[in-house]
Amino acid sequence: MRLNTLSPAAGSKPSKKRVGRGIGSGLGKTGGRGHKGQKSRSGGSVRPGFEGGQMPLKQRLPKFGFTSRKSLVSAEVRLAELAKVTGDVVDLNSLKAANVITKNIEFVKIVLSGDLSKAVTVKGLRVTKGAKAAIEAAGGKIEE
């Protein structure tokens, strides 16, 4: 077997549809576009969301809300995820190194969810009451 003798299995590569090449091809004359109308023309189609001049649904519905800039740089971390951090000190950089949070996160709050198996020292992160109790029960401590 050589590279120049390789060929695809028979029937695995159907031939491309060639439109407008005579009535015998089955796609001659109108080329599968039907007769007349906007969609039969070259470049003739309406943009997505266009409703024929009627006020589009997107514009009929009211605007509401916004995306808080603070939420883009804030994250909540579960207690169970602290196990992924190597070492016993948990801070912003160690969470990023363990891929628990993304690099653009600046503020982290640790929440009570799951179990904490090892004693850890939490530095410079916000902690909920329940999470604080669980960390201290596991033999860890919280430093501001």
Curated annotation (Swiss-Prot):
Residues 21-31 have a biased composition (Gly residues). It comes from the Bacteria. GO terms for biological process: translation. NCBIfam families: rplO_bact. PANTHER family: 50S RIBOSOMAL PROTEIN L15, LARGE RIBOSOMAL SUBUNIT PROTEIN UL15M. Part of the 50S ribosomal subunit. This is Large ribosomal subunit protein uL15.
